[in-house]
Amino acid sequence: MLRGIDISNWQAGLDADSAFPNVDFVICKATEGVGFVDGYCDGWVQWCRRNGKPWGFYHFANSNDPVKEAVHFIDNTSNYFGEGVPVLDWEGDQGIDWVNEFVRVVHDQTGIWPWIYANPWRFNQGGVEQNCMRWIASYPDVLNPGLDYDPGEPPETDGLVGCWQYASDGRVPGYAGNLDVNIFFGSVGAWQAYAGVPSSGQTDKPTGQSVLENDRFRVTIQEK
């Protein structure tokens, strides 16, 4: 089990040298819509690369054509695939067909299925691409939890809950403000598998690999 944060230009004052050593992983906003690129993303990604920190990168969905948004995401992060975990941040009025089109374009062009971040109810509508791991946002009633907080059981969805954002006002040493804090129910090896990093002795993504982290959750990666 890993604990980490997701950040964007809204945390422009965050100093990686102060905060990142205190977390297990970092997910950075990379793009939005068809024209926005987060100027802080690459600096944070390079810190993670230099220091061996698991990391991810996400696209914030707008309501443009999903193919154009996917291409914008890929074009501006092409050298991230195979190292970090790609994510679609689904918070707007996009329908399920929009989401599925986006993630399938990403997979078709990169060979990697992105995670999908959303509230549980969005997944529970049914029909969301099952190859994509679910990163859910659901907040227990607690003020300013840290990375050591136990939020209990995550809400159920229609698929695998691999990551849970359990607060938007979390606190992490090295940063004075609120942060999104998360639990990943897997190991560093599982994280790398989602990113498409080849494991030792393998030339491609693992096939049929299961990683059991505790008595409640199992992360399974199956090549399609």
How should these model regions be labeled?
Residues 60, 91, 119-121, 139:
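Histidine- and/or cysteine-centered catalytic micro-motif in compact active-site loops
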Residues 111-124:
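Aromatic-lined carbohydrate-recognition surfaces of secreted/lumenal glycan-active proteins
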Residues 35, 64, 123, 143, ...:
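Flexible, glycine-rich phosphate/dinucleotide-binding loops
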Residues 1-18, 129-205:
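Functionally critical loop-and-helix segments that line ligand-binding/catalytic clefts
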Residues 1-112, 131:
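Substrate-binding cleft of extracellular glycoside hydrolase catalytic domains
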Residues 44, 75-77, 121-125, 144-154:
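Intrinsically disordered, low-complexity boundary segments flanking structured domains
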Residues 204-224:
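Short, low-complexity, charged amphipathic interaction modules
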